[in-house]
């Protein structure tokens, strides 16, 4: 059963990221209080768009192929999240704070809701954040490009090969769909220097 509805950007269906529907798959939420259907959308809106949180900026740079030395403006951050969908695999709070790990029961229970979400969102690319998550994924249709990256909050995270794999998956999806993307995967029209703390 799905508890946390996915974030679906306003341009996910019409334009996507570089003309491709990209679903970013996180691992889990942590928190206290009541789990609600809108929790994921509230988190992405607050920390991906309205405020600046390194975790969400790292995801944007990873998925959009943006250089680590590039400062992403507030407008660019907001625009990115309108182009993609985001969903957390585990459908329960794992604990009251970060680094609380899902239980085996949580991992197993998450598959049906994830497959229903895939059927609903029809992504062309799924970007899986976290190598451990890879071990628990159910079979995903072969028509979907699936790529993996270390979790952006993991110690010593580097964009390196993960970024390249994601960009290749987006390119393959765009070409196999029979259409070329209208815009590059990198949504930045202009760049500026990186600012401290990001």
Task: Give the ranges of each region predicted by the language model.
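A polyanion-binding, active-site-adjacent surface
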Residues: 1-125
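Catalytic metal-binding/acid-base residues of hydrolase active sites
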Residues: 29, 90, 132-133, 153
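C-terminal capping/extension of enzyme domains
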Residues: 97-115, 133-198
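An amphipathic alpha-helical core segment
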Residues: 123, 131-134
